[in-house]
Amino acid sequence: VNGTPPNVRLVVDVSARQLAENQPDFEVTLVMRAQGHVTPGSDAAAAPVSVYEADISYAGLFRVAPGQQENLETLLLIDAPRMIFPAARSLLLTLVREAGFPVANIQPVDFVALWHSRRARA
């Protein structure tokens, strides 16, 4: 790598599971995979070369208040990952930086769009 931050492809997934039946506690896991690519030399037609792949899983525990069951899916798959994303992003960028690669800024994820995309595929 010539010191220029690689182009980063970020793949994000979210999952949620109830910790115990009939309990209001849930574990929400945010999985992030960053793949850094550079174009070798000055040839814009050259195929990008992968220089790193970093994967993390970051989870949070959430208790859903009584009366919020009708919003359960959006609470767990939109609001909860939105809350834990900044810390997960920080850890991912630290991992890449400590591996010796220049870091590129990772923009916030649109968890509403991700949720709609997952629902459309289901």
Regions found by a protein language model. Give the residues of each.
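N-terminal intrinsically disordered, cationic/polar leader segments
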Residues: 1-83, 89-122
